[in-house]
């Protein structure tokens, strides 16, 4: 297994730059004053398809040979990777098949179909999406592009942190949402090269703490599909590639509750006029857990995406759940 390096992130950046948005870096004076720190949000909710996933998908599809492109690609995803592969394939005239769970957010399903992909549904609690995807790939000769455990996907995801660090300079800490580990591992490659002294934290839902268990035990831990509002982090385990990078480059894995995610969503909407999906707030909520240690520090937080059904969003942020004090 050849693990990707920062050199692969650089190559990915050059390969996809004509397709991706250079997403904005957002700040809040009020938040900085309250925390006594400089906080920089990387707004991947403003990326094409509304999430960082487009970076890795575009890099992976772009690297396919003409022969593989002609046969088509297949991916399995709860939503953002599905849209990312569908759009990447459309831009490069590659047929795409996407395996999506029956309970995937309607917004994400509709967007994926809108990009022209063929969608196959499955039950995420009783069926194995990876097995379905690999079987279809073998039967039809599709190129399988998994949502996180793929060198080209990891390299593409790392371009977000690369942009952040190039814009704001070296950081003392970086907080990154964690599902399967594609964004965290890619971000770690970038941060270790561009900001060697930066502490890197992955943040996942309490209900899905397989990453934390894996990090502390030294081997990949598998769990049942977690029930959490962070649908983009409903993964059962880290990948072989992502875990190898995380184990060597990440300082710690934190967990946060759904209530903490809601509080962060509410703050971003009310104070910064930014709409994000629950998964995007994992890094923000994790930073708040460490706020006493961040006083006087320069901190990066990646907001991973903004694909959330508006009715669901309104229900979540209008609730009375208590979260961390911001």
UniProtKB/Swiss-Prot annotation:
InterPro entries: Ser/Thr_deHydtase_PyrdxlP-BS (IPR000634), TrpB-like_PALP (IPR001926), TrpB-like_PALP_sf (IPR036052). SUPFAM superfamilies: Tryptophan synthase beta subunit-like PLP-dependent enzymes. Its EC number is 4.3.1.16. GO terms for biological process: amino acid metabolic process; modified amino acid catabolic process. Disulfide bonds: none annotated. The modification N6-(pyridoxal phosphate)lysine is found at residue 53. Disruption phenotype: Cells lacking this gene grow as well as the wild-type parent strain on SD medium, but fail to grow on hydroxyaspartate-containing agar plate. Keywords: Lyase, Magnesium, Manganese, Pyridoxal phosphate. PANTHER family: SERINE / THREONINE RACEMASE FAMILY MEMBER (PTHR43050), SERINE RACEMASE (PTHR43050:SF1). This is L-threo-3-hydroxyaspartate ammonia-lyase. It comes from Saccharomyces cerevisiae (strain ATCC 204508 / S288c) (Baker's yeast).
